[in-house]
Amino acid sequence: KSLGVATLIDGSQGAVHMPVDVQEIGCDFYPITGHKLCGPTGSGAIFVSAERMAEMRPFLGGGDMIKEVHRDSITYNDAPMRFEAGTPGIVQTIGFGVALNYMMKIGLKNIADYEAGLKDYADKKLTALNWLKLQGQPNEKGAIFSFTMENAGHAHDISTILDKKGVAVR
């Protein structure tokens, strides 16, 4: 930041797990993805600092983003409206709002606590399997598990077997 370089922190993964104070972390941009917060695909939001918002110019034109049109010039609306060219994704925006309300009603701490319980349970069960080796440090990872298996065959075969048992793999 001291060199004038814009900072973007991708909040898509973390926003569902913890509250974030964008003022405290001091970033210029903080985008979040709606579908990772139980919202519809194609929805999301982005925080843009006032400093960066003032520097940005629209790359499209039309709709309510334009305040005045003259023969030789265009005056854009104030931010954030100057970035709203065309019809917004109304259904996605409403769905995203409902999803955020749902997440807030449950509570991010409650979600994190429940996820931690699932992680601990899975860690305990998987650690007990002598033919499977977990990768990473148990206390330093989220609820995604990477593992290796000796003489297990092809990864696709393993994922098919796990899928039939109700375990989501990627």
PLM regions: where:
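Pyridoxal 5′-phosphate
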Residues: 1-170
